[in-house]
Regions:
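N-terminal membrane-anchoring/stem segments of glycan-assembly enzymes
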Residues: 1-26, 316-319
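Cell-envelope/extracellular polymer assembly enzymes that use nucleotide-activated donors
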Residues: 31-34, 63
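Acidic donor-binding segment of Leloir-type glycosyltransferases
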Residues: 51-98
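Long helical/loop segments within the catalytic core of UDP-sugar-dependent glycosyltransferases
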Residues: 86, 91, 96-103, 107, ...
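Short aromatic/hydrophobic "clamp" motif used to bind/position activated sugar donors
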Residues: 120
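Acidic donor-binding/catalytic loop of UDP-sugar-dependent glycosyltransferases
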Residues: 124-140
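Catalytic donor/gating beta->alpha subdomain of glycosyltransferases that bind UDP-sugars
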Residues: 147-172, 201, 206-269
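Membrane-embedded multi-pass helical conduit in multi-pass membrane proteins
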Residues: 279-354
Length: 359
C-alpha cells in the first residue's frame, strides 16, 4: 500500500503540475524545425488525411522530410508534385531491395541527413496532431533542451478493447513521462520526440543497428540526460495513433517493441516493475484478508482498498486531463484489475524471441 501511494502521489502525481517553463532557457527564440517521417508503404491515407494536418501547423519556419522506402515510382512522383503546393515538404526515396531490407533507423538516418535544420522532430505516418499547435509547442520545447519528449495517445474507438488499449498506452507512458519529470529521463516515444543533429552525430548515429527497434529508447538512453530534456505536456501537443486492430494486434505490437526492454538499465526495469509488483501483492493480500482473516482485518482491507482506488482514480483523472485523454476514469477499476494479467501475458511472450526484432 505504501509503495502504491508513493508512485501515484509522489511520482505519477508530478505530471499534472509539471511546468517546463521552470527550466532555464538555452535558446532565446523557437528555432526552425525539420519534421522527419519514414514511409514504408504507398500510404495514400497518410498523404490525403494526415500530411495536410502537419503542413497546416501554425508555425512560421519548418519543413517536413518524408523518407519513402519503396519501388513505386508513381507514388514517389506524387510526393514530389505535392511540393509544388506545399514547398515546406521534402521527399527522399530509398529504393526497396528485398535482398537488403531497410530498417526504420536507416530511413531515419537518411531523413536526418536530408533535413535542412538543426532541430529535428520525429513522428510516424499513422499518427495525426490533435491541434494546429502541436508543432509550435514541441518546437518551443527546444528553447529549454536539446531533446524534446511529447506524448502520443491512441485514437478513441468503440468497445471495451479500445478502452483498454487507450488506457494501457496512457498508463505505460506515465512511467517514462514521470521519470523524465522527476529528473531521470530514459526514453522517448517514437511517434512524438525530437533531438538536435549535434547530439545525433555526436553519438555517431543510432545504436543497436542489428535491431529493427530502439530508436526511441535504446538510442535515447545514450544521449539523454536530466539537463538536456524538455518534456512537453499539453492536450494541444498530443498526437493520436490510429488503431489497426483489437487486443490481439495490440499485444503483438507490444511484444515487438517490448523486445528492447531486456536492454534497459537495471534501475529502469526496477522502476517499471515495482509499481506492477506492489499492485499485484496488494490485491493478493487484500483478497486473502477478505477471504480468511478475522472481521477486523476484513474491515481494514476494505478501507485500504477503497482508499487506494480513490487515490488512483483521482490521479488518473488529473493525468488524463493533462495529456488530453477523455473517458478514461469511468471504467478505470476494470483496467486496474485486468492490466496485471496483460502484463503477465506480455512477459511470457517476451520470453520467446521475436524474429521481427532482429535484422
Amino acid at each position: 500500500f505504501g509503495i502504491q501511494l508513493y508512485y501515484y502521489l509522489f511520482v505519477y502525481g508530478r505530471i499534472p503540475k509539471y511546468k517546463d517553463t521552470r527550466r532555464p532557457e538555452i535558446l532565446s527564440e523557437t528555432p526552425p524545425v525539420s519534421v522527419v517521417i519514414p514511409l514504408f508503404s504507398e500510404d495514400y491515407a497518410f498523404v490525403e488525411e494526415i500530411l495536410p494536418l502537419i503542413v497546416a501547423q501554425e508555425y512560421p519556419d519548418f519543413e517536413v522530410v518524408i523518407v519513402y522506402v519503396g519501388r513505386d515510382t508513381d507514388f514517389y512522383d506524387d510526393l514530389v508534385r505535392i511540393k509544388q503546393s506545399f514547398p515546406q515538404i521534402t521527399a527522399t526515396k530509398i529504393e526497396l531491395n528485398p535482398r537488403f531490407p531497410i530498417s526504420p533507423k536507416m530511413a531515419l538516418n537518411v531523413g536526418i541527413k536530408s533535413a535542412h535544420y538543426e532541430h529535428l522532430l520525429f513522428t510516424t505516418p499513422d499518427v495525426y496532431p490533435s491541434s494546429d499547435r502541436w508543432l509550435s509547442l514541441m518546437a518551443n520545447g527546444f528553447r529549454r533542451g536539446e531533446i524534446v519528449l511529447g506524448y502520443c495517445g491512441m485514437e478513441r474507438g468503440k468497445g471495451f478493447a479500445s478502452y483498454l488499449i487507450r488506457t494501457w498506452r496512457m498508463m505505460h507512458s506515465v512511467d517514462w513521462i514521470s521519470s523524465a519529470v522527476c529528473g531521470r529521463p530514459y526514453r522517448g516515444m517514437r511517434q512524438n520526440y525530437g533531438f538536435t543533429k549535434r547530439l545525433y552525430f555526436g553519438a555517431n548515429g543510432f545504436s543497436h543497428l542489428n535491431m529493427n527497434i530502439g530508436e526511441d529508447d535504446l538510442f535515447m538512453s545514450r544521449i539523454i540526460a536530466p539537463g538536456n530534456v524538455s518534456v512537453v505536456l499539453s492536450p494541444r501537443a498530443t498526437l493520436r495513433e490510429k488503431s489497426w486492430g483489437g487486443l490481439r494486434w495490440w499485444i503483438g505490437t507490444q511484444r515487438f517493441f517490448g523486445g528492447a526492454i531486456p536492454f534497459y538499465p537495471l534501475w529502469v526495469k526496477n522502476f517499471i516493475q515495482w509499481e506492477l509488483g506492489s499492485r499485484i501483492l496488494f490485491w493478493l493480500a487484500a483478497i486473502v484478508a477478505l477471504a480468511v482473516m478475522p472481521w477486523e482485518f476484513k474491515i481494514a482491507a476494505g478501507v485500504l482498498l477503497l482508499a487506494r482506488f480513490a487515490i488512483v482514480l483521482v490521479e488518473a483523472r488529473r493525468i488524463s486531463r493533462r495529456l488530453g485523454e477523455e473517458k478514461i476514469c469511468g471504467r478505470y477499476f476494470l483496467y486496474d484489475l485486468l492490466s496485471p494479467f496483460f502484463a503477465l501475458l506480455l512477459g511470457l511472450l517476451l520470453l520467446r524471441k521475436d524474429e521481427r526484432v532482429w535484422r
